[in-house]
Swiss-Prot record:
Record's protein name: Uptake hydrogenase large subunit
Compartmental location: Cell membrane
MF GO annotations: ferredoxin hydrogenase activity; hydrogenase (acceptor) activity; nickel cation binding
Role according to the record: This enzyme recycles the H(2) produced by nitrogenase to increase the production of ATP and to protect nitrogenase against inhibition or damage by O(2) under carbon- or phosphate-limited conditions.
Annotated EC: 1.12.99.6
Primary location class: membrane
Length: 618
């Protein structure tokens, strides 16, 4: 490949090669390779999906009413979003509208997933890319208490004694030699910039979040029977309502259980307000003060989402996180996105391990083909079963390359918030709350927090702050906060509707396949925790003729396309300086901001390919 320019980036594969394999993700496993120059700045990035999903093939010929139960197993963390996309796709194909109660219950379940997933992502999968756990042992508990009260004065757990107790527990844990999730971190790396007190505060909240998250998912067990993988139903939700029912034999949804749901929603709201959002604002401020605003990639230019959380069911114009597409960083123009339009969403495979008749042409998901074609490029180092270095000039990933009108796009909470901000600036009242959150965050990061900490104030605009690893992490926290607030309204609407006498939870008018047309096609979209999720289905003679999923990591983790355009993962790493390539904190920090999650092994390689060191990636 050597060097070429695309999307405003100058790619150059000369220089030292670093291989991260695997950086796991929910839909399989991901590998990442980068080249760094003499100054340890990333000049080339290659993202590889190393595992074939293949569920689309499994679904062919099956009953479309069962599809949700299969596709839900794509993911065990963002549990439920694939089921929701699937039932929406089938309902769209068969023109089924669900009852109001079912809509509100689905909304509560979807937002529960969002807040749970975002909290687990930040505190347990991503925070340690920002937080030096060992540094927390050096913290002054009194100063930590003062810091807590500066950034979040309403949080009740903020005494010096509380932080001293957590610090002592951490010290005993470290001295035991059994570090568990803290094993093999890059503790002491100069890539970490937080003072000891901020590290102790963050570790403390890591433990608080661990306790709370297990309670929040019980909302799924009430409405969906279990978690992970709660039950869904084409036409509604599989739970009956009886407000006056009591005991185990009563209908699953009664006032006792609804009160339990309300208590969890209140917990979520308080945690987001007093812990999650303040933590991200404080950490983001301190890294911004250190000049670390890297990782923006495609977020600075091209973002996409389908829109979610309608204020009025089946009315996309009332989406409280409105969708669309922004190109070339122009926040003054939002293009409408229609997932049914064959000229808008297309998947390419010129650099993917799949086969099309003509690989210079993209296919709309309704016409998608999932035929594997595992071939390695001539410059690949290693073997078919043990690749040492990818040849990105050839096919190099099990992920296809989705494009919107030919453009590579970033999806996720950051994309949703950039779009919401753009919509609100143009007068969309339903997007006003995200705009308020963003403007408050900018004021806190630029002025309020630096002033409270005795640091110089800054004047960064949202357009400078948001397209970054910090911005991507902040958007998740703000979305979690917003979802908690919307859940509060959903709960009150649900109870009011039931008390008005409506107990319907399913529309079964078209449950019998005899009522279906001989052929139908539909699409279901969801604002999944990691980004824009779409399921496309074709139904023929009562069976699935074709099924395609385009998941968030397909968009973000996509390889190059036939024009050489890089995907969001690859773009986000470009031009990032590394303190020490043998401890690639910066690579993990940015990749984890997309939430590829979970533990994996990292191998750091020299330009000649010999291994320098082996480390564990959280």
């Amino acid at each position: 490949m050597s060097a070429y320019a695309t999307q405003g980036f100058n790619l150059d594969d000369r220089g030292r090669r670093i291989v991260v394999d695997p950086v796991t993700r929910i839909e399989g496993h991901m590998r990442c390779e980068v080249n760094v120059d003499a100054n340890n700045v990333i000049r080339n990035a290659v993202s590889t999906g190393t595992m074939w999903r293949g569920l689309e093939v499994i679904l062919k010929g099956r009953d479309p009413r069962d599809a949700w139960a299969f596709v839900e197993r794509i993911c065990g963390v963002c549990t439920g979003c694939h089921a929701l996309a699937s039932v929406r796709a089938v309902e769209n194909a068969l023109d089924i509208r669900i009852p109001k109660n079912a809509h509100l219950i689905r909304e509560i379940m979807a937002k529960t997933l969002q807040v749970h997933d975002h909290a687990v992502h930040f505190y347990h999968l991503h925070a340690l890319d920002w937080v030096d756990v060992m540094s927390a042992l050096k913290a002054d508990p009194k100063r930590t208490s003062e810091l807590q009260q500066l950034v979040s004065p309403a949080h009740p757990l903020s005494s010096a004694g509380y932080f001293r107790d957590i610090q002592n527990r951490l010290k005993r844990f470290v001295e035991s030699g059994q570090l568990g999730p803290f094993m093999n971190g890059y503790w002491g790396s100069k890539a970490y910039v937080l003072p000891p007190e901020a590290n102790l505060m963050a570790v403390t909240h890591y433990l608080e979040a661990l306790d709370l998250q297990k309670e929040w998912v019980k909302i799924h067990t009430i409405f969906g029977g279990k978690n992970p993988h709660p039950n869904y139903l084409v036409g509604g939700v599989p739970c009956a309502i009886n407000l006056d029912g009591i005991g185990a034999a009563s209908a699953p949804v009664n006032m006792e259980r609804l009160s339990f749901v309300k208590a969890r929603i209140d917990e979520i709201i308080e945690f987001n307000k007093n812990v999650y959002v303040p933590d991200v604002l404080a950490i983001g401020t301190l890294y911004k003060q250190a000049g670390w605003l890297y990782g923006g990639g495609l977020a600075a230019t091209n973002v996409l989402d389908y829109g979610e959380y309608p204020n009025v069911a089946y009315n996309k114009s009332t989406d409280q996180l409105p969708g669309g597409a922004i190109l070339n960083g122009n926040w003054d123009e939002v293009f409408p996105v229609d997932p049914r339009d064959s000229q808008q969403v297309q998947e390419f495979v010129s650099h993917s391990w799949y086969k099309y008749a003509d690989e210079s042409v993209g296919l709309h998901p309704w016409d998608g083909v999932t035929e594997p074609n595992y071939v390695l490029g001539a410059n690949t180092k290693g073997t078919r079963t043990r690749i040492e270095q990818i040849d990105e000039s050839a096919k190099y990933s099990w992920i296809k390359s989705p494009r919107w009108r030919g453009h590579a796009m970033e999806v996720g909470p950051l994309s949703r918030y950039i779009l919401a901000y753009a919509h609100a600036r143009s007068g969309n009242k339903y997007a006003e709350r995200p705009k308020e959150q963003l403007e408050y965050s900018a004021q806190m990061i630029n002025s309020a927090i630096p002033k409270a900490l005795g640091l110089p104030e800054t004047q960064y605009t949202l357009k400078q702050l948001l397209p970054s690893t910090i911005g991507r992490t902040l958007a998740r926290a703000l979305e979690s906060q917003y979802c908690g607030e919307m859940m509060h309204s959903d709960w009150h609407d649900l109870v009011a509707n039931i008390r008005a006498g409506d107990t319907a939870t399913a529309n079964v008018d078209k449950w019998d396949p005899a009522t279906w047309p001989l052929q139908a096609k539909g699409v279901g979209t969801v604002a999944a925790p990691r980004g824009a999720l779409g399921h496309w289905i074709r139904i023929k003679d009562g069976r699935i003729e074709n099924y395609q999923c385009v998941v968030p990591t397909t968009w973000n983790g996509s390889p190059r396309d036939y024009k050489g355009q890089i995907g969001a993962f690859e773009a986000s790493l470009m031009n990032t300086p590394m303190v020490n390539p043998e401890q690639p904190v910066e690579i993990l920090r940015t990749l984890h901001s997309f939430d590829p999650c979970l533990a994996c092994s990292t191998h750091v390689m020299s330009a000649e390919g010999q291994e320098l060191t082996t480390v564990k990636v959280r």
